[in-house]
Amino acid sequence: MSLSQVSPLPHIKDVVLGDTVGQGAFACVKNAHLQMDPSIILAVKFIHVPTCKKMGLSDKDITKEVVLQSKCSKHPNVLRLIDCNVSKEYMWIILEMADGGDLFDKIEPDVGVDSDVAQFYFQQLVSAINYLHVECGVAHRDIKPENILLDKNGNLKLADFGLASQFRRKDGTLRVSMDQRGSPPYMAPEVLYSEEGYYADRTDIWSIGILLFVLLTGQTPWELPSLENEDFVFFIENDGNLNWGPWSKIEFTHLNLLRKILQPDPNKRVTLKALKLHPWVLRRASFSGDDGLCNDPELLAKKLFSHLKVSLSNENYLKFTQDTNSNNRYISTQPIGNELAELEHDSMHFQTVSNTQRAFTSYDSNTNYNSGTGMTQEAKWTQFISYDIAALQFHSDENDCNELVKRHLQFNPNKLTKFYTLQPMDVLLPILEKALNLSQIRVKPDLFANFERLCELLGYDNVFPLIINIKTKSNGGYQLCGSISIIKIEEELKSVGFERKTGDPLEWRRLFKKISTICRDIILIPN
């Protein structure tokens, strides 16, 4: 259930709310624009205060995020806080819109990005954290993929100061932290093991190293830096000198840098000052200007999107439909009746439908067709989706796909975990239901019968958009929550989108790729 269904969102003067672009346990983020000037796009974060208090947070805890992010908003790689206020049940924060979307929505699991892209984002993250530590005295304490966004030119924007803390006092002395906070794979070992406390700024440096590893390999080195985790223990025993698994993909120069950062003893860990002098940080990326910002968004997008691919091959299809070990990558405990994933009418996302339909209408009216060619409706739809990077990731002809990508490259907030289909619902839903079951996601049986009941109640024209809320666990045992939305764009053309709410973006993309492969026969692919 969305927060707006629990309590109506407050009205914000002169601001028009749009789609929900993110949602967590006690907060949601919507895009918005100014009423007087729709060209000025914003993001509004709504924090549900009663839910926060149920989770044990005080008023000071709730407002601390605003205080610290406001203090840290004068750096180009930190998401800027514009305004905030409190209503009866919500605290709302107006932020600049990261209109390039999520960085890790664009990274292929188990592949990562090429060295130039990793270097560029590593440099920008180091710059942002250096600003936080040196000029603001603030440690972020939750550096992870979910909190790395992009602007319209592809520049990194560090977001979410919910766990941040002021580690340096006004007199220059450093506070010692005692609490365990952060996301397990990105957490520094001293957060778990230090009995005398730790310095929060040093834990940020560790998290930067883990994020760099993920950029280079498309996976985390371990689930938790714990002595119970064999991957982490192996790393410690070999003093970071590893050449197997994902470590074997990393060039020697980058391995050397990672070993300096991922030093379990925080007193031996490289400092930010030393990190800024590393050759990989000093050498400018090919699409980076003197100010460290992207000066060639098209080249950056080309490099970033080039590794995105969903293979619908027979080999992958057989692996996902017949291999028991593959099917068990995602774990789902036996749910009680009301936890079964089921098909519902999504009354909260009318705006999303309107935007998608407007995109097609705009494309349709701006496209000149040669009446002599007699272009079919299906050909028109296929041409329309060729403007969406999400559709191109299924293309089997790499050269043809690269040409399409070059024509339509741009950063935008649209999710890439999506496919299009022309299949009727009596074909689409049984195949989707099969894919969910094979992914160990428990579904209320017969999605199509449920769809027919909704049609009787609402009528076919009013039944869309549809939503299936899903909950599962990754191989590491961490929760993945999100939804699958089915949106009717025009007549038979529909989009099937996978929206992550909580959990690792790379694990969510793995799940999307698996379900898409099982649904391969219904996916519309540009050709």
Swiss-Prot record:
The active site is at D142. InterPro entries: Kinase-like_dom_sf, Prot_kinase_dom, Protein_kinase_ATP_BS, Ser/Thr_kinase_AS. Keywords: ATP-binding, Cell cycle, DNA damage, Kinase, Nucleotide-binding, Nucleus, Serine/threonine-protein kinase, Transferase. Disulfide bonds: none annotated. It is an enzyme of class 2 (transferase). Pfam families: Pkinase. It is found in: Nucleus. GO terms for molecular function: ATP binding; protein serine kinase activity; protein serine/threonine kinase activity. SMART domains: S_TKc. Its EC number is 2.7.11.1. GO terms for cellular component: cytoplasm; nucleus; site of double-strand break. The keyword Thylakoid does not apply. Belongs to the protein kinase superfamily. CAMK Ser/Thr protein kinase family. NIM1 subfamily. Present with 2530 molecules/cell in log phase SD medium. PANTHER family: CALCIUM/CALMODULIN-DEPENDENT PROTEIN KINASE KINASE-RELATED (PTHR43895), SERINE_THREONINE-PROTEIN KINASE CHK1 (PTHR43895:SF32). Serine/threonine-protein kinase which is required for checkpoint-mediated cell cycle arrest and activation of DNA repair in response to the presence of DNA damage or unreplicated DNA. May also negatively regulate cell cycle progression during unperturbed cell cycles. Controls phosphorylation and abundance of PDS1 to prevent anaphase entry. Also helps prevent mitotic exit. This is Serine/threonine-protein kinase CHK1. It comes from Saccharomyces cerevisiae (strain ATCC 204508 / S288c). The gene is CHK1.
